[in-house]
UniProtKB/Swiss-Prot annotation:
Pfam families: Ribosomal_L19. The gene is rplS. This protein is located at the 30S-50S ribosomal subunit interface and may play a role in the structure and function of the aminoacyl-tRNA binding site. SUPFAM superfamilies: Translation proteins SH3-like domain (SSF50104). This is Large ribosomal subunit protein bL19. It comes from Acidithiobacillus ferrooxidans (strain ATCC 23270 / DSM 14882 / CIP 104768 / NCIMB 8455) (Ferrobacillus ferrooxidans (strain ATCC 23270)). InterPro entries: Ribosomal_bL19, Ribosomal_bL19_CS, Ribosomal_bL19_sf, Translation_prot_SH3-like_sf. Transmembrane segments: none annotated.
Length: 114
């Protein structure tokens, strides 16, 4: 194992729950406003996972005031304090980019049973 891999392993300490595309997740993020720091919750559907070791990330999409909002979170960022899985989605794709073109009830995802 070379030195870069060792440093990456040290940085990858955060433990995320098992979730994938289609799952509804609530991401707790530290937000700094001036001298104050608070935790903000971003809840939506995970539409993509990117597994690249230390550079892993996941994309969460939600509808806010009728407008679609997507945010990419690095998996091992110290600003991501917690990820909660609200419900499991039953999907057949790894990337759900087609949800960007759908609106309303068409953009719903079936819940995985069992």
């Amino acid at each position: 194992m070379n030195i870069i891999d060792e440093i990456n392993q040290e940085q990858m300490q955060s433990v995320l729950p098992a979730f994938g595309a289609g799952d509804t997740v609530a991401v707790h993020v530290k937000v700094k406003e001036g001298d104050r720091e608070r935790v903000q919750i971003f809840e939506g559907i995970c539409i993509a996972r990117r597994n690249r070791g230390l550079h892993s990330a996941f994309t969460v999409r939600k509808i806010s005031n009728g407008e679609g909002v997507e945010r990419v979170f690095p998996s091992y960022s110290p600003l991501v304090t917690k990820v909660e899985v609200k419900r499991r989605g039953d999907v057949r794709r790894a990337k759900l980019y087609y949800l960007r073109d759908l609106s309303g009830k068409a953009a719903r995802i079936k819940e995985k049973l069992g």
